[in-house]
Design a protein with these regions (language model features):
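Membrane-embedded helix-loop-helix hairpins and adjacent transmembrane boundary segments
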Residues: 17-543
Length: 543
């Protein structure tokens, strides 16, 4: 699957809008009661479990008293989000779709164990709040500001996709305007983070994880009850472009030399994705902040390793996608519904709303909504912590007698970042609205391609015994971002939105084909080499 630039014809757009109205009528008042009840229950329970918030350690690290299994469940809930819930089934449902996305799980597991047994002991040498504190201690304040800026940029880009995904769910089942959905999502995420910091975030994540699994299992049971698994397997054998295709195929050994733009291959999974996942779980504060909530290296290591079971959730949602494809081959949708299914991202929420019993459909969709919020409240806590660390430093944050003042300030910063993230979601919707065939999974991973490589490069510079210069790291970061911008489709879209259609068309015409995943190791190497080369000139030395 590639994230390409497509435009819906006006007729398709009108048909899609008509479909939204038809679908949301199936969402009954019982569903609304279930959704409202679940959200109220989760909010109240999260508040009750938040504990005391007397200082910054309580707010951002949960007092370092959280059990490892809750931290692991929170990591899985954050990783999954609504992106997996509707993006993965939609990806399989597409006529050319299959299970090859599952191969990426190998790279994910390799990276988690590498983080658990190599990186966590380094982080626990000192009392720190983020990997950026670790890098700042070793490379200086300039490096800390660089990686914090990269993290903030990558978070806004990546999480805005998750805001968009959740808005799609709400739009399909409620008929509300997508922009209003985005504002509601942002407001709930701010509220949950504001209430109790990481304690609330982690415990609500555990609840979301349980409901998310329940929703996926229930959907699969209902599909298999209607169609046997053998029938689902048979119906997933199709002909695409005159060739037979098994939509349950999950292995692909095509090399990047044969098809450089192909992303779901074993070579990408084993070579490129370990770098992406090592950065995601070892450098991205969205996930690493959970490790710091554990009371010991042993607990943090267990939390990280056991989070590998998330691959089973991916298998579950791939199976749901195959089931949905078979379902609609047997139960052909109306022309209006079929028109909206050209955007595979609408398939699962539409099926839930129309085919699942009232009340149960509300519960499943509440789980999808809450799973999305669990990712967003996590990133708000992470952005707040890293921002305060840069502007105040750990000494001021931990100063005796200023604990409650810092907690109040943290909550204000959470609100500010919440508004920024909501605005980014609105901006992304403006782009997606005219390109609704985009592969959301590819879009999410493509967004982090801008920053993950440089982040990993700076971490390597902090760990390796070499001379580096922060200015070189900045140069490498700029080169990396420019390189990704050349290969990715977002820049032409932005230029087109600004009215620079000539430039956009020219850039699209001359854009090379290469899967975004290869930029994780490539840009890490570029950033590290630039820092090392400038450091070798003797302009600066690593402390």
């Amino acid at each position: 699957f590639q994230s390409e630039v497509f435009s819906l014809k006006w007729l398709d757009l009108l048909l899609a809008c008509a479909t939204m109205k038809q679908v949301h009528e199936y969402f009954t008042y019982w569903d609304w009661i279930v959704v409202a009840g679940y959200m109220i229950f989760t909010t109240v329970l999260g508040h009750r479990l938040s504990g005391k918030q007397s200082n910054i350690k309580d707010f951002f690290l949960g007092g370092k008293t959280l059990p490892w299994w809750s931290v692991s469940g929170s990591m899985i809930a954050t990783e999954i989000s609504a992106l997996t819930f509707i993006g993965v089934p939609g990806m399989v449902y597409a006529m050319a779709g299959d299970w090859t996305y599952l191969q990426w799980g190998f790279g994910s597991i390799i990276a988690r164990f590498a983080v658990a047994y190599w990186l966590i002991p380094l982080y626990y040498e000192k009392e720190i709040y983020s990997p950026y504190d670790f890098m700042g201690d070793r490379l200086g304040e300039g490096a800390r500001r660089l990686v914090t800026g990269l993290f903030s940029l990558g978070s806004i880009l990546g999480q805005s996709v998750r805001v968009l995904v959740t808005a799609i769910i709400l739009q399909v089942v409620t008929g509300m305007d997508a922009r209003l959905c985005i504002v509601i999502i942002g407001a709930v995420a701010i509220l949950w983070t504001f209430m109790g910091g990481m304690q609330t975030v982690i415990w609500t994540d555990v609840i979301q994880f349980c409901l998310f699994i329940f929703g996926g299992v229930l959907a699969m049971v209902l599909l298999v009850n209607e169609l046997s698994w053998s029938q689902i397997v048979e119906l997933n054998q199709v002909t695409v472009d005159g060739q037979d295709k098994d939509k349950l195929r999950w292995l692909d050994f095509t090399t990047p030399f044969q098809e450089p733009s192909l992303r779901y291959t074993m070579w990408v999974a084993l070579i490129a994705m370990p770098f992406q996942n090592f950065t995601a779980f070892g450098v991205d504060q969205l996930n690493t902040q959970r490790m710091f909530c554990c009371g010991s290296i042993k607990d943090a290591r267990k939390a990280m390793c056991w989070s590998s079971v998330s691959i089973m959730v991916t298998v579950l949602m791939l199976a749901v996608g195959a089931g949905l494809f078979a379902w609609y081959r047997v139960n052909a949708p109306s022309d209006l519904i079929a028109a909206s299914f050209e955007k595979g991202n609408n398939v699962f929420p539409t099926w839930i709303t129309m085919e699942v019993a009232p009340g149960l459909s509300g519960l499943i969709l509440a789980g999808a909504f809450a799973a999305a919020i669990s990712s967003l409240d996590s990133i708000l806590a992470a952005l707040s912590q890293t921002s305060l660390s840069v502007f105040y430093g750990r000494d001021k944050l931990e100063a005796e007698g200023r604990g409650r003042e810092m907690v109040r300030l943290s909550r204000i910063v959470v609100c500010v970042w919440g508004v920024i993230l909501t605005a980014a979601g609105l901006g992304l919707w403006a782009v997606y609205e005219n390109n609704q065939d985009s592969d959301l999974i590819g879009l999410a991973f493509g967004m982090v391609a801008y920053t993950y490589g440089p982040l990993l490069g700076v971490l390597a510079a902090a760990i390796l015994p070499i001379k580096v210069d922060t200015r070189g790291l900045i140069m490498g970061t700029v080169l990396s971002v420019l390189l990704v911008s050349w290969f990715r489709p977002e820049l032409p879209l932005v230029l087109g939105a600004l009215g620079l259609t000539g430039w956009a068309e020219e850039l699209t015409l001359h854009r090379p084909e290469l899967s975004s995943e290869w930029f994780f190791p490539l840009n890490a190497s570029i950033t590290l080499c630039c820092g090392w080369l400038v450091g070798m000139l003797g302009l600066n030395r690593k402390p």
